[in-house]
Regions:
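An aromatic-rich alpha-helical recognition segment common to small helix-rich domains
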Residues: 20, 37, 48, 72, ...
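Repeated polar recognition positions within modular binding domains
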Residues: 66-70, 90, 158-162, 182, ...
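Beta-strand-rich modules
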Residues: 1-3, 72-91, 164-184
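Extracellular low-complexity, O-glycosylation-prone stalks/linkers
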Residues: 40-60, 67, 84, 100, ...
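Short, surface-exposed linear motifs at loops/turns and structural transition points
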Residues: 34, 50-51, 60, 72-73, ...
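Pro/Thr/Ser/Gly-rich low-complexity, intrinsically disordered linker/stalk tracts
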Residues: 3-41, 77, 94-134, 169, ...
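Solvent-exposed strand-loop boundary residues in beta-sheet-rich modules
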Residues: 1-2, 52-55, 91-93, 144-147, ...
């Protein structure tokens, strides 16, 4: 007799393993981007890829499904990067993958290259910094009362000095600066640079 077989039905492995959920960028610096995602209970681990040189390249593969964070280092400042993550499950020597989830992240704009402080008198200190061509202006903050408080915001990137007055004599003060760039309704900030200055006794 003759046996008739039906056509094969192909089941994609990815349909059996759900895509990674809540994938997002959680923190950025001028050279790092940290990616995080939710745990996939059915996965063995996760594969993280970066788009570079015109193609996708695997930059990390976790060995378990409890590692839910990865920091990509060595990046250029003020640059947008594309990443994608997928879960994988290995069983019986066979590895199945979920669909990809894509994420984009942008590194921070650079900060000023130099930030210094000097005592002017018993009640004032002068802060100086180098020009940042990528900035619209700068925000200067002082640490007082247990927290950082903005004490000046420049309206341009050519103002490169600020004198802080009304200070106590012979006292050390902490200051920090960050660059900002305004484009339309969007404002981007750099990381901080800090300095400690003591007034004249």
């Amino acid at each position: 007799g003759k046996t008739n077989y039906s056509d094969y039905v192909t089941v994609k492995a990815s349909t059996l393993l759900g895509a990674v959920k809540n994938a997002k960028v959680t923190s950025v610096t001028g050279s790092w981007i940290t990616l995080e995602w939710a745990k996939n209970d059915k996965a063995t681990g996760y594969s993280i890829e970066q788009y570079k040189g015109g193609k996708w390249t695997v930059i990390a593969t976790t060995k378990n499904n409890a590692t839910l964070k990865f920091t990509v280092k060595g990046l250029k400042n003020d640059t947008t990067y594309s990443f994608r993550i997928r879960a994988y499950k290995t069983a019986g020597g066979v590895t199945a993958y979920s669909d990809y989830v894509r994420i984009a992240g942008k590194t921070r704009i650079p900060n000023v290259a130099k930030f210094t402080g000097s005592a002017v008198s018993a009640s004032a200190v002068k802060l100086d910094w180098s020009k940042n061509d990528k900035a619209t202006g700068y925000v200067i903050e002082q640490y007082k009362g247990g927290k950082w408080t903005a004490i000046a915001t420049t309206k341009n990137n050519t103002t490169l000095t600020f004198t802080v007055k009304g200070l106590a004599k012979g006292t050390a003060y902490s200051f920090r600066i960050k660059s900002f760039r305004k484009t339309g309704s969007t404002t981007e900030f750099s990381e901080y640079a800090s300095v400690k200055v003591k007034t004249v006794e």
